[in-house]
From Swiss-Prot:
This is Cytochrome b. Its cofactor is heme b. Pfam families: Cytochrom_B_C (PF00032), Cytochrome_B (PF00033). GO terms for cellular component: mitochondrial inner membrane; respiratory chain complex III. Heme b b562 binds at residues 83, 182. Heme 1 (or BL or b562) is low-potential and absorbs at about 562 nm, and heme 2 (or BH or b566) is high-potential and absorbs at about 566 nm. The chain crosses the membrane at residues 33-53, 77-98, 113-133, 178-198, 226-246, 288-308, 320-340, 347-367. It is found in: Mitochondrion inner membrane. Belongs to the cytochrome b family. It comes from the Eukaryota. Component of the ubiquinol-cytochrome c reductase complex (complex III or cytochrome b-c1 complex) that is part of the mitochondrial respiratory chain. The b-c1 complex mediates electron transfer from ubiquinol to cytochrome c. Contributes to the generation of a proton gradient across the mitochondrial membrane that is then used for ATP synthesis. It comes from Genetta pardina.
Length: 379
């Protein structure tokens, strides 16, 4: 008699995805972030569900309902802070996951990669709308500034912004619809993540060497389930250190001031995980140009497979490309720092140089280094 996990229609899907899945024998800890993203998503959906039970999406009561959650609801404070800092952990894992894909050439699985880019946009949209919900100063002004960017779209821009706002400014209608979207999007993300896995399992996982590993596979369980549990424990440790010791470390103090349309905060800035894109947006003096650069800062990942010139898939044996990769990481950290600074000299110039370098690495330097490394192979 066959094992139930191999015969039952539902159990069979789980078995082929997480138990008997053939996995390369040499994948490193950089391959842990996929499962960690799944865990982050589950944590966010669960904590978000409990927060939604007590939250009211009305401009008059939104701020006080969040205060009520923190002060009066049993363990409301910890649920709220796990949700807020869980978003930060989500983005840390997301950046590591994408970075791994760029470094080891996982982008050659184009279907999986493109679904991943779509997932990234969806997660960013969800996080942005979630940041608006507490209805603090930074929530209100962040929503005003970011939605206003759509007015740069020629001809339909102004109508589009007013349509999204549901009026002539960010108000009750905007908050209500943002709550509705923020609630539904994580379930769409879950569905996209399932499609992401479906495409990945069509090809099998990549590995650090970038070489096809069909002749050397091991079962996912117990080897990688144990490895994933170690990563999970470390994730929970870092998350709980944040939540219990410095829950407001990554937040903005201005968001503890109720939203006031008559008083603009001195520096309007998004959460830390959007600062790199915000710096790229601000580095271009033209509004439409800035919006295009903002979108392209993520969308540029879609053309990485097209600009892959090297004969080797992974960067493991490509020192020149490795230098460029770490230059890109340093550049992103610089952009993140610049995004949080006021718009004044020397930050404007640094931001512009960092933005030029960001696009140059992807569009020029990486493809050229691939060609040079191909030549070096013949020496």
């Amino acid at each position: 008699m066959t094992n139930i996990r191999k015969s039952h229609p539902l159990a069979k899907i789980i078995n082929e995805s997480f138990i008997d899945l053939p996995a390369p024998s040499n994948i490193s800890a950089w391959w842990n972030f996929g499962s960690l993203l799944g865990v982050c998503l589950i944590i966010q959906i669960l904590t978000g569900l409990f927060l939604a039970m007590h939250y009211t999406s009305d401009t008059m009561t939104a701020f006080s309902s969040v205060t009520h959650i923190c002060r009066d609801v049993n363990y409301g404070w910890i649920i709220r802070y796990i949700h807020a800092n869980g978003a930060s952990m989500f983005f840390i894992c997301l950046f590591m996951h994408v970075g791994r894909g760029v470094y080891y050439g996982s982008f050659t699985f184009t279907e999986t990669w493109n679904i991943g880019i779509l997932l990234m946009f969806t997660v960013m949209a969800t996080a942005f709308m979630g940041y608006v919900l507490p209805w603090g100063q930074m929530s209100f002004w962040g929503a005003t500034v970011i939605t206003n960017l759509l007015s740069a779209i020629p001809y339909i821009g102004t109508n589009l912004v007013e349509w999204i706002w549901g009026g002539f400014s960010v108000d009750k209608a905007t908050l209500t619809r943002f709550f509705a979207f923020h609630f539904i999007l994580p379930f769409i993300i879950s569905a996209l993540a399932a499609v992401h896995l479906l495409f990945l399992h069509e090809t099998g996982s990549n590995n650090p060497s970038g070489v096809v590993s069909d002749s050397d596979k091991i079962p996912f369980h117990p080897y990688y389930t144990i490895k994933d549990i170690l990563g999970l424990l470390l994730l929970i440790l870092v998350l709980m250190l944040l939540v219990l010791f410095s829950p407001d470390l990554l937040g903005d103090p201005d968001n503890y001031i109720p939203a006031n349309p008559l008083n603009t905060p001195p520096h309007i800035k998004p959460e830390w995980y959007f600062l790199f894109a915000y710096a790229i947006l601000r580095s271009i003096p033209n509004k439409l140009g800035g919006v295009l650069a903002l979108i392209l800062s993520i969308l540029i990942l879609a053309i990485v497979p097209l600009l892959h010139t090297s004969k080797q898939r992974s960067m493991m044996f490509r020192p020149l490309s490795q230098c460029l990769f770490w230059l890109l990481v340093a550049d992103l950290l610089t952009l993140t720092w610049i995004g949080g600074q006021p718009v004044e000299h020397p930050f404007i110039t640094i931001g512009q140089l960092a933005s030029i370098l960001y696009f140059s690495i992807f569009l020029i330097l990486m493809p050229v280094s691939g060609i040079i490394e191909n030549r070096l192979l013949k020496w």
